[in-house]
Amino acid sequence: MKIFGRLDLILLLAGATAAGFLINSLHAATQDEQANEHAVEQAVLAPITAMFDAMAKRDAAAIKKPLLPGGGMVLMRDGKPIQMTFDAFADLVGKPGKAKTEERIHDPLVRIDNDLAVVWAPFEFLVDGKVDHCGTDLFNLVRADGKWLIASVADTGRKDCSGK
């Protein structure tokens, strides 16, 4: 019993080949989109990394560079908000000192809409290589003249960083 004729078989193979090309094209497009999305997320994270690097160097001028002038911070400490301008923060953190400090974020959640971005990430703040406090950082960023700047920062800071 003949299920497929030659023409049916040729059409079936042609359809399968076309479907394969379509799937490969869609896969390549998806990979390109993912690569572009990753590049955009890295561009959003770059000013945060620059600020952390400048904080570790205690360089007030460099701390201010990736910050939107006039912006500010809200640091939650013991259930109370501490507000300060970016200038006050940079002057405080940019003071010379003997202790080696470093802030690290991990698993950042990045959301972008045109020229506005939000980054939510757990963090650890280390002093001389040991965790001093931890919590969650929240960064609001804006893109001005093609450059991402931190517009505001909020964080929770707590000492109970068990397992860190």
Protein language model regions, located:
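Bacterial N-terminal signal peptides
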Residues: I10-N24
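Surface-exposed, charged secondary-structure patches
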Residues: M84-D132
